């Protein structure tokens, strides 16, 4: 994993097709990301890789282009993250990974569900039983088994739970439910006023009892 991180190619994707990611969307998002990196470090996490914003004086070997043309960020990896740390419970929007060690499967599932967010989840394993245990126990709107969220599955509902998303499931056939409501219509064609189901005064109990007696 660290080898992949260290060899990540960063730059302007409009000029270079093989870069993994480009600059931050805006200066405000760049500042928010740098603030979150500081939160990781003050929480006590161990930084394995990353040097904040990419500059001409501080840039990865595989950076291509002019660092002054955008808010480019190093990829960051933080280890030794625990459940009591602030960075464990926050969404960091940018190239950063926080690594949490789990004791076993149950503990890993607990850690995943301890997040206040639940948009997407993923489980990588060769054990199908473990994968389906994860699928049944995870509190998230989407789950990938040996696959990450692609965001382009038009036939599947998209949405999250807890603090993620607005709860709707837009995409697939479920989009009809998201943007419509049920309307019940009873069209009487006999020309007679029909009794409602709760109008029981006209029910002939004696005849009903006789019918049941005949069946007996």
Residue ranges and their predicted role:
Residues 9, 62-216:
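Conserved C-terminal structural/oligomerization subdomain of aldehyde/semialdehyde dehydrogenase
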Residues 44-57:
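Short secondary-structure junctions
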Residues 15-21:
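Short linear capping/connector segments at secondary-structure termini
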Residues 23-34:
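Short beta-strand to alpha-helix junction loop
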Residues 15, 56-57, 131, 152:
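Generic structural signal for helix capping and beta-alpha/helix-loop junctions
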